[in-house]
C-alpha cells in the first residue's frame, strides 16, 4: 500500500482492482497513434499494457486522506455486488476493498467526508 506525506497530511492509495481494461486500447483511446504508442512498449509492457490482447492495464483505487482533523475518502471505486453487465470488469465485483481500507487504518465509520471526482460508475461504488 502506498502512502505519501504532504506536510502533516497523509494520502494512502486503496486499491480496488488492477487489470486489463474491458475494451481494446484503441477503443479506450480513440485517437491513438499506434506508431507513437509502440515506442513506449519497453516501459508499458507488461505492467501497463497487454499487447497480446491489446488491453491497457488500469487501476481502480480510492485515496484515503488524513489531515489530522478529517479522514476523507476520495472516490469510492466501483463497489462489490453491483449489476453492471455492460461493464464486465465491474459486474458483480467481489474484492476485499473494505479489508484494504481497514489495513490502511480506517473503517467506513471513521470516514468524515466522501468526495467523488466525477460520477462514473467506477468512482461512486
Label each residue range with its predicted role.
Residues 1-103, 110-122:
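Metallo-beta-lactamase
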Residues 125:
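Conserved nucleotide-sugar donor-interacting segment of glycosyltransferase catalytic cores
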Amino acid at each position: 500500500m502506498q502512502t505519501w506525506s504532504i506536510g502533516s497530511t497523509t494520502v494512502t492509495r486503496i486499491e480496488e482492482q488492477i487489470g486489463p481494461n474491458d475494451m481494446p486500447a484503441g477503443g479506450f483511446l480513440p485517437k491513438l497513434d499506434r506508431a507513437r504508442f509502440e515506442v513506449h512498449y519497453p516501459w508499458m509492457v507488461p505492467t501497463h499494457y497487454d499487447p497480446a490482447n491489446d488491453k491497457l492495464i488500469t487501476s481502480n483505487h480510492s485515496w484515503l486522506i488524513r489531515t489530522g482533523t478529517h479522514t476523507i475518502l476520495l472516490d469510492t471505486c466501483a463497489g462489490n455486488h453491483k449489476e453492471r453487465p455492460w461493464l464486465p470488469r465491474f459486474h458483480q465485483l467481489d474484492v476485499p476493498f473494505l479489508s484494504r481500507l481497514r489495513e490502511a487504518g480506517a473503517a467506513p465509520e471513521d470516514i468524515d467526508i466522501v468526495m467523488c471526482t466525477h460520477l462514473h460508475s467506477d468512482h461512486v461504488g
